[in-house]
Amino acid sequence: MSFSVDVLANIAIELQRGIGHQDRFQRLITTLRQVLECDASALLRYDSRQFIPLAIDGLAKDVLGRRFALEGHPRLEAIARAGDVVRFPADSELPDPYDGLIPGQESLKVHACVGLPLFAGQNLIGALTLDGMQPDQFDVFSDEELRLIAALAAGALSNALLIEQLESQNMLPGEAAPFEAVKQTQMIGLSPGMTQLKKEIEIVAASDLNVLISGETGTGKELVAKAIHEASPRAVNPLVYLNCAALPESVAESELFGHVKGAFTGAISNRSGKFEMADNGTLFLDEIGELSLALQAKLLRVLQYGDIQRVGDDRSLRVDVRVLAATNRDLREEVLAGRFRADLFHRLSVFPLSVPPLRERGDDVILLAGYFCEQCRLRLGLSRVVLSAGARNLLQHYNFPGNVRELEHAIHRAVVLARATRSGDEVILEAQHFAFPEVTLPPPEVAAVPVVKQNLREATEAFQRETIRQALAQNHHNWAACARMLETDVANLHRLAKRLGLKD
């Protein structure tokens, strides 16, 4: 089989038709799955010896949240090392990273696998993976044809990463540094709330404004602070962390501003405070609402004038520090109650950010669950950790009052429980492995029984027609995948579809 000009043109058109990088990537993957008639396809970005999924088709949704470290996935490592098309034989002993992650085929292992490394110049920037359940599924495509596909994908990914790099550095195209993948803290989530938060982080990171990050406990406020710092001009300098809630009143001032020898009992030497440590960098003050009013006044002075005084010292030190503060309280209410200074609140909240709770993030819970499953797999040396359909359903309907932190702990506990009840190094998480309070799941949809107005032959054909339509919709009109889903021969399916008027 060879690709026609029309097929390649269609792929190129789909890449241009999308609105934004994510949409283009998804169109590419969906189109490739249809053209190649494979069971699953994925576009991965390479960063720091791991592959990060950008778009998937035919795979469980939690794959988008997983981070595939090369040392834990020998097939992906082989793709990263190769400079060309990689075809894995059906009897390869190397485990496939997507085993158990193809919906409807969880109990089966991938038999056909092709990896296409993607390059920008000499730099590896990503990979395309194509998977099928039939051993010889991709034999009809030559390496040259697959290289054409890889070239189109590499061009799209390279352009997206270059634009991202230029935007993060606030550079014009003519001023671009040599290409390299942009490294930043991974913030997992595609929900509208997280998409908006990421945009706001990109905007404020390039400035030097103070930022107030608000959100419930466990939502990931520290991760937001790291993302801001890493995307800012101060990224080459330290990010210093201080939990204000853990500061005893007796040492809080010393922790913030430092002290000199003899300033108080136990001060046996000079000591720098967090502001000095963060000079030319960023200071993250977690739980800022827990600071006493006296310390709030001293913090305000630093923000106003940029100088500090060590405890016991009359001299002032100039510091250049960007302050990121976080709180799980409503500081406006705290100001009205007299527990937080209004002037400090306004100094800190020049650019406020709000981190949405997990219950408002929709399918992000599944992406995050995939991320934590992969972490557990590596930590415990397992070959795979996957979520059953029942577990996914439970996670999507639980409220998560403890937010992302609660989800992380729940996944870790479930993996340990599932591992204890199953021999081998493969773990499938079921709903019973999660110790959540009672969750009311939506009842399964029951189709209404229609009044019979057809003879048996007409009713049978109507049922067959609707079943094929649904299977085609679920498989993006991929006839080969549809045939496998319906457990019939693809040639017989084509003949039946023609008889039923579904094909010309």
From Swiss-Prot:
Residue ranges constituting the Sigma-54 factor interaction domain according to the UniProt record: 187-416
Listed InterPro entries: AAA+_ATPase, GAF, GAF-like_dom_sf, Homeodomain-like_sf, NorR, P-loop_NTPase, Sigma_54_int, Sigma_54_int_dom_ATP-bd_1
Pathway listed: Nitrogen metabolism; nitric oxide reduction
MF terms (GO), sorted A to Z: ATP binding; ATP hydrolysis activity; DNA binding; DNA-binding transcription factor activity
Pfam families referenced in this protein's UniProt entry, alphabetically: GAF, Sigma54_activat
Any one GO BP annotation for this protein: phosphorelay signal transduction system
SMART domains attached to this UniProt entry: AAA (SM00382), GAF (SM00065)
Keywords: ATP-binding, DNA-binding, Nucleotide-binding, Phosphoprotein, Transcription, Transcription regulation
Residues engaged in binding ATP: 215-222, 278-287
Top-level taxon in the UniProt lineage: Bacteria
Modified residues (4-aspartylphosphate): 57
Gene3D superfamilies: 1.10.8.60, 3.30.450.40, Homeodomain-like (1.10.10.60), P-loop containing nucleotide triphosphate hydrolases (3.40.50.300)
DNA-binding region ranges: 479-498
Function of the protein: Required for the expression of anaerobic nitric oxide (NO) reductase, acts as a transcriptional activator for at least the norVW operon. Activation also requires sigma-54.
Name of the protein: Anaerobic nitric oxide reductase transcription regulator NorR
Organism: Escherichia coli O6:H1 (strain CFT073 / ATCC 700928 / UPEC)
Lineage start: Bacteria, Pseudomonadati, Pseudomonadota, Gammaproteobacteria, Enterobacterales
